Swiss-Prot record:
An example Gene Ontology molecular-function term: phosphoribosylanthranilate isomerase activity
Matches recorded under SUPFAM superfamilies: Ribulose-phoshate binding barrel
GO BP of this protein: L-tryptophan biosynthetic process
Keyword Isomerase in annotation: yes
This protein's encoding gene: trpF
Organism encoding this protein: Acetivibrio thermocellus (strain ATCC 27405 / DSM 1237 / JCM 9322 / NBRC 103400 / NCIMB 10682 / NRRL B-4536 / VPI 7372)
Database matches in InterPro entries: Aldolase_TIM, PRAI_dom, RibuloseP-bd_barrel, TrpF_fam
Pathways per UniProt: Amino-acid biosynthesis; L-tryptophan biosynthesis; L-tryptophan from chorismate: step 3/5
Name recorded for this polypeptide: N-(5'-phosphoribosyl)anthranilate isomerase
Amino acid sequence: MTCVKICGLRRKEDIDYVNLYKPQFAGFVFAESRRKVSKETARMLVKALLPQIKSVGIFVNEKKETVAEIVKYTGLDCVQLHGDETPEYVEKLKELLGRITEKRIEIWKAVRVKNKESLEIISEFDVDAFLLDAYVEGSYGGAGAVFDWQLAADVAAGHERIILAGGLNPENVKTAVAKVKPYGVDVSSGVETDGFKDAEKIRDFIMKVREADGGVLS
């Protein structure tokens, strides 16, 4: 079954929506963005999630100590690194997280896909998952742009945990899942109306993913 991550949650009603439709992951943005949440708000929202929905914190070029502090304070399950973090940064972050929490925290690394060569960096990292997003000049993600899914499909064929992001929405996600066969899909703006999460779009998105998997929404 393809996992679903609904990203950019910032309101209590957003949590109500994901608790109703039950994606596997819920994302909270701590980088500069209109969807950015404070650690206090994130802690409240994470606590309101159903226990089976894992929380993911999105960080861009943040200090390791700050990431670890936020993870401990909010109770996050996963860290998504969406900037220019290096393999050395990842290893040091793992060590730091291991010292401050008994829970194993997953680490995901985002890769901004421009061409085939931009994917070569994957071999340098030891992380739990890679999130493939479209390369957009001057942006670290969340731009709603689509990239060549064939590039993602080629990577997904050789990696168990590839998460597809970038311009996904209820209209195109079924085709994307069928073509790429990723471990998971990630959506933010594609399930929003006027800049806020839309319950019907979240439902439709997850339903289309399940259709691609050959099943139906439970």
